[in-house]
Amino acid sequence: MSGEQYLHWHDGVEFDEATQTWRGYIEDNNVRSNKHLTEQTFDDKGDAIVAASKMLSEARKGRPPA
């Protein structure tokens, strides 16, 4: 995907009850099944937010997650 295709995506975080950790993600606004999670999990929600934001920024620059 080109960076322009990520203009209609958003970032967010989700909490895993089983591990008590957070993960960041980016998701297509129009196709909810099109979602990329951060590889790393985080104990702190703020760290997951930063990771998700960085992932979306990189995708918009033409470097989408694998």
Segments from the language model and where they lie:
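Short N-terminal "domain-start" leader segments
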Residues: 1-23
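Contiguous segments within soluble domain cores/interaction surfaces
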Residues: 2-6, 29, 61
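Acidic, low-complexity, intrinsically disordered interaction modules
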Residues: 19-21, 25-36
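A short, exposed loop/beta-hairpin motif centered on an aromatic-Gly-Thr core
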Residues: 31-47
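Short arginine-rich
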Residues: 53-66
